[in-house]
Amino acid sequence: MNRRLSIGGITMALAVAWLVAGCGGGDDAPRFVAVPPAASQPEPGPGGGNGPGAAPAPRILVVSNRADLVSGGDALVEIQWPEGVDPATAKIALDDVDIAKAFARRPNGRYMGLVTGLKVGDNTLAAGLPSGSARITITNHPIGGPVFSGAQMQPWICATRTAKAVTVKGNAGSAPASATATTKASGLEGDPVDDQCNAATLYTYYYRKASAPTSCTFGITGGNACYTQYDPASMPADSEIADFTNDRGDTAKDLIRVERGTINRTIYALAAPFDPRDTSMPWAPPKGWNGKLVWQFGASTGFSRFQSGPTRSLFDASGGLGLQRGFMVAIASLTDHGTNANDVLGAETMMMVKELIAEKYGRIRYTIGDGCSGGSIKQASIASAYPGLLDGIQPQCTYADAFTPIIELADCGELQANYYANDPSGQALTAAQRAAINGHTSTGFCAAWISSFLPALNPSRAQNCGFPANFPLVYDRTANPKGLRCAGAEHAMSQLGSFVGDDGIERGNGVIDNQGVQYGLGALRDGALSAEEFVRLNEGVGGYDGDLVWQARRTNARRESIGIHYQAGFVSDGRQLAKVPIIDLRGNQAATGDIHANWRAYSVRDRLDRDAGGHGNQLIWKFNSSSGSSAPGAALARKAFVTMDAWLAAIEADTSANPIEAKVLSNRPAAAVDFCIASNGANDADLATTVGLEDAACPVKQQSSPRQVAGGPRAENVYKCQLKPLALGDAAYGGARFTDDQKARLAAVFPDGVCDWDKPGVGQVPVTPWLSFAAGPGGRPLGTAPVSVAAP
């Protein structure tokens, strides 16, 4: 199916006749490719061939994406001809079909074209001269996916123009076999045309009136909105349209187009400066667009099985900061963590949309990420596992990735929802002692986790999958053991894999483990716990089974389950995060309890220090707020955006051969340093007085977590620790004296030893970037990008 279905205004069908130019110069991989750099082409030998004495042959470059990751049936291609060759004499063929008319030399001097009609699978593109030929294999994937994420999750309920009841099939062996669910409304003008949820793209057009007051609200809705919708078939007169000058000095009419479509079984939307009277082809981008992209990631955590619309607004604070400077803004439901906590799917979707932008609008210079909480997870995870998709990230309400917060979440549940609540020894602990064990200023922090996200680990909770409560197809250990499991490990089963337990139930590879963890160790050392209270705590804490049911024994995760999380790139790695500038806007946590704890920004910093040898690429800008998820004030958000833009522009201009990590460090703006302010940064005056992050005057203080009190690293990226013998004379116990009975009881709690935090975790390995899960869970490196080769 041609992915370029469209509705509204003008049709954007990309035909073979779209001949490309103006996409940048030189042989370097364009920034919009955003995938591992293509392997260098062999240097031409005498006469322009591919080796000493070889006949002159062209070079073929697929520039909209890696040649093996193309989707949607088309690819932007450049052909570099040997010096002195007249391309008019050349033959260009796609699987032996002549497509020479798709190419031409453009004003930038590059010979380019958009190749369409690619079949799913391998396609051979050849360019030939009497003196020599070349060919490259382009592997095309369906516009509905997948590309590298592996087998797509089923069932998956496509969105429809208006919500309606549909029949949903359950897993094989489910009782019942099917049930009725209600679709999500798509916001499009037509229903899906296939089971990949593909539907026609909708375009809507807006202009800013020349008479609009300067006090109007930047957006398209509301009585004071700056923009008014129009029909491009009957445009307002130019005199009625305000002028707009972007950040590179280009002046155009203040016109914006919003594109809403489907890709990879999700719904995406783009907003960009766009005048429908211009050509606006990839070789002639919209005049008002500065070539930059802001990607807005949505918050929260969820494992939905429904196609739905994005949760972020293209015209919110971040989008407005970008659009007013000439940026394009992008959103997609699979990059909203509250819809999709599978960050491989998020990365794949982002790559596919960026390819679409490159082929439809032109070259992307660089991409800035933005998002709070789950939106910060998406940024860090994608930057770590799929470097190049994001060039700079602006996390707020930070978490380093999706699954390591489960460490604190499970610990809080085991401690506060069970030991403190149900065990007489736990009930006897004071609030101050409990807070000391938890690593928090109050027990409200664990309470916030337990009430908000502990249920997200429950595979029987239908709402986690987007279904109503008690939906009959969802897993129940007794009534429906073959039902749909609605937890994160199952949502990512194509990447993380699964196992069948002794009870015959298939479960995703999870990460909960507390073998060898000495809860309250720091509290014992500091005198907040007695030796007996420490022993009773570790005797009574227990653990969770595979269905989030508390049990008296501790949780002992399978080594294979733990290891695959690292192997598959689900734990963010400082080695990869060092490749992007990071500006972390750290709001103050709520004093009474907050899942967005201040220490989380330092978790990322600790990973950078441990993995990359420093954190010069990360800025932490603390501001005072009512909760950790509060948005920064307008002036602080603007300062972060402008600083990130300047940082990336400097990196873009750096033509040295230095690795990207070095370029990030050497091009950091001189004034870009850590700081803390006493307000939320609503206006410029709020930013005039700053103090250091650890200054006593900074209101944003750090805490820790139960696992850190137990001796774990602030990086909080060790699911399952390696063990060492119990040695109660160690300095870690702060000189506490244990009776023989207490020693024996601790030895019974830790028969195999206690955590050795000086060693990596079990199965803990560095991220291997750009894994493909097409061959199954665990992932395989993509390997070298395809290049053109001389053809006989």
Specify the residue positions occupied by each region the protein language model found.
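C-terminal His-loop and adjacent cap/lid subdomain of alpha/beta-hydrolase
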Residues: 31-792
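Bacterial N-terminal signal peptides that target proteins for export
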Residues: 1-10
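C-terminal motif of bacterial Sec signal peptides marking the signal peptidase cleavage site
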Residues: 19-22
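Bacterial lipoprotein signal-peptidase II cleavage site
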Residues: 24-32
